[in-house]
Amino acid sequence: MEQRVIISTQLESELVSALSECEHDKLFVLTDTTTLELCMPVLQSFYCMKEAHIITIPATDSHKDIDSLMMVWKGLQEGGASRHSCMINLGGGMITDLGGFAASTFKRGINFINIPTTLLAMVDASVGGKTVINFGGLKNEVGVFNDSKFVILDTEFLKTLDAENICSGYAEMLKHGLISTEAMWEELVSFDLDKPDLKQLQRMVGDSVKVKERIVEQDPHEQGIRKALNLGHTFGHAFESWALKRKPILHGYAVAFGLIPELYLSVAKTGFPTEKMRQTVNFIKEFYGTLDITCDDYDELIELMHHDKKNQNGIINFTMLGGIGDIRINQTATIEEIKEALDFFREG
């Protein structure tokens, strides 16, 4: 299924148009407890939403699990959903990931529309057809590839976000800059995240989405170049799963932290320029701080990396860079090199 991404200037009319192309007998909206309060009132003011059934699940990524998935299935079932129904996922990455999976599996699949409300969801989670939940203490363990019919990006929702959630989404934009062009990367590492210019950010969101769209179009099921989007995620997912048992961190923070050791490995193994690595790392440390790991945590982190779905034949798989936009997929590193990269993360 082809996904259409709309950068919205008039949410109501664009939603009406999208719904007219998603013929449906019943309409459902999935929210979490946060977006129900902050974002749903916008949709409820639209005439096209007057008969929509609202399903609400608990907020935060710790609830992106099978219990919440069952709540959504139950809400669809009790609301009388059929194979011809449609669900709108209104929320951040947790909602678009889990809602997409629920819609893709209920009655073998119903149409769904993503309206992302966080920066992270706008530039990453809602685009590209990955639908997924966490399982067994592991991040993004169970899911399917299935495109939403539409993704409608309304950057007005960014005004509902706190600084931490802006930073979280921005990490994926920084990754997109690293795998794209020098000009894009330079703008991203020069941006003041402490006092973000929302107008500038809105334009940058459009640029960032285009990077992901271009890559996904070439490789929808992650057999090759789409692995570029995994930059920062091999260490990042391990950091995120490690933190889940202690003090959970937002996904974008985990990705930002993951970029540090992965750029270090890129310098050591694929010739990424040291100065550009330093500039990127300094930006991350300035706006994201650090994660309080010790060398005693290395074995647990490496074990978590061994569960990464990108791995082949039990070997931990990385995406590295030879330069800005010079993508090297399917790279490996020894355990000693991984530990050196973790040393750099802690001390560099």
Per-range role (PLM):
Residues 94-100, 122, 238:
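Short glycine/serine/threonine-rich phosphate/pyrophosphate-binding segments
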Residues 190-299:
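Active-site segments that bind and position negatively charged phosphate/pyrophosphate groups
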Residues 1-86:
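ATP/NTP phosphate-donor binding region
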Residues 76-90, 97-114:
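Non-catalytic interfacial helical region
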Residues 173, 274-348:
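C-terminal charged capping/lid subdomain of soluble metabolic enzymes
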Residues 101-193:
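A glycine/threonine-rich phosphate-anchoring loop and its flanking beta-alpha core
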Residues 78-81, 147-150, 156-163, 171-183, ...:
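Generic secondary-structure signature for well-ordered alpha-helical cores
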